């Protein structure tokens, strides 16, 4: 009887290890958001723009930092945005001046949605 229990337990543990090992190791935080790259603009043909995701995270503000804030906040966030590293000013057929991005990278976010 004891041998049957240990064999059954071994089979269950082996099955759990196989399931855990087959689980994908990919990072789930960026699912649905592509890497920061150049893509064609949907409105202006032949104009490239930087789109995609970079790094962002939020965490509870440490007490020491919170005590030095003028307006204490419970959550602190860090982020980098997909921005143009280089670009050139061009004019569209309709006379609109736009920036055609030539290279992208992740850098400090200057504009945040409120």
Swiss-Prot record:
Which InterPro entries does this UniProt record tie to the protein? Cystine-knot_cytokine, Glyco_hormone
What positions does the record give for glycosylation? 74, 100
Q: Which branch of life, at top level? A: Eukaryota
One of the entry's Gene Ontology molecular-function terms is: follicle-stimulating hormone activity
Listed disulfide bonds for this chain? 33-53, 36-82, 50-104, 54-106, 81-109
Its GO CC terms are: extracellular space; follicle-stimulating hormone complex
* Keyword Transmembrane helix annotated: no
Keywords, A to Z, come to:
Disulfide bond, Glycoprotein, Hormone, Secreted, Signal
Q: Chief localization class?
A: secreted
Which interval of the chain is the signal sequence?
A: 1-22
> A Gene Ontology biological process annotation?
thyroid hormone generation
State the compartments where it is located: Secreted
Q: Which family does it belong to?
A: Belongs to the glycoprotein hormones subunit alpha family.
The job of this chain, per UniProt, is described as: Involved in gametogenesis and steroidogenesis.
> Subunit notes for this chain?
Heterodimer of an alpha and a beta chain.
The identity of this protein, by name, is Glycoprotein hormones alpha chain 2
What species is given as this protein's source?
A: Oncorhynchus tshawytscha
